[in-house]
């Protein structure tokens, strides 16, 4: 089996599917964090928060998660802010979507394109895609939001037209 973070072979059979060095680099902990919610709840919350606009924009279901870094049992949870990770679970509409996103991001890394830290993580219903948030600077007293670019900007689309590309419609006149 290969590491779900770096893709290199694991030296020993490991339940987490991650190298210890990858866990430390990605999460800053010595143990792989557990996801505190079951997959049914995860999918329900991801759908609700995406539809209500309470999460990172996009058409794919996703959740913003906070790392509670208890040294004995680190966990990713919905409570507490600031959020430091984005989790994208499996979806019924598209088979292996998290694995596909991980593949594309790994290919971008290999091509020398700068990407956010990304990996796969095990859940009850299979693998989920996880990425570190890089659109915020976190300090002890505030959260500074940073401007970020995305692939829709390559098509010269305005923010309000971001999702019309998924419907194969024309962008708004400029």
Residue ranges of model-derived segments:
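Conserved ATP-binding subdomain of kinase catalytic cores across diverse folds
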Residues: 48-159
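A short mid-domain helix/strand-loop element embedded in enzyme catalytic domains
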Residues: 158-167
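Regulatory N- and C-terminal appendages and interdomain linkers associated
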Residues: 1-32
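Short, compositionally biased low-complexity segments
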Residues: 5-7, 14, 36, 74-82
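Short low-complexity stretches enriched in small and charged residues
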Residues: 14-23, 38-47, 84-89
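Conserved small/polar residues in nucleotide/adenosyl-binding loops
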Residues: 168-174
């Amino acid at each position: 089996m290969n590491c779900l973070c770096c893709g290199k072979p694991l030296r020993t059979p490991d339940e987490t599917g991650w190298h210890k060095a990858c866990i430390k680099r990605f999460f800053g902990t010595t143990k792989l964090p557990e996801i505190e919610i079951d997959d049914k709840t995860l999918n329900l919350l991801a759908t609700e928060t995406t539809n209500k606009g309470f999460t990172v924009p996009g058409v794919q279901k996703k959740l913003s998660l906070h790392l509670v870094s208890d040294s004995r049992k680190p966990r990713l949870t919905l409570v507490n802010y600031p959020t430091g990770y984005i989790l994208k679970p499996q979806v019924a509409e598209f088979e292996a979507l998290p694995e596909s996103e991980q593949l594309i991001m790994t290919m971008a890394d290999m091509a020398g394109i700068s990407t956010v830290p990304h990996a796969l993580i095990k859940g009850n219903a299979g693998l989920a895609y996880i990425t570190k948030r890089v659109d915020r600077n976190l300090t002890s007293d505030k959260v500074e939001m940073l401007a970020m670019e995305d692939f829709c900007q390559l098509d010269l689309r305005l923010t309000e037209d971001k999702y019309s590309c998924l419907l194969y419609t024309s962008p708004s006149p400029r």
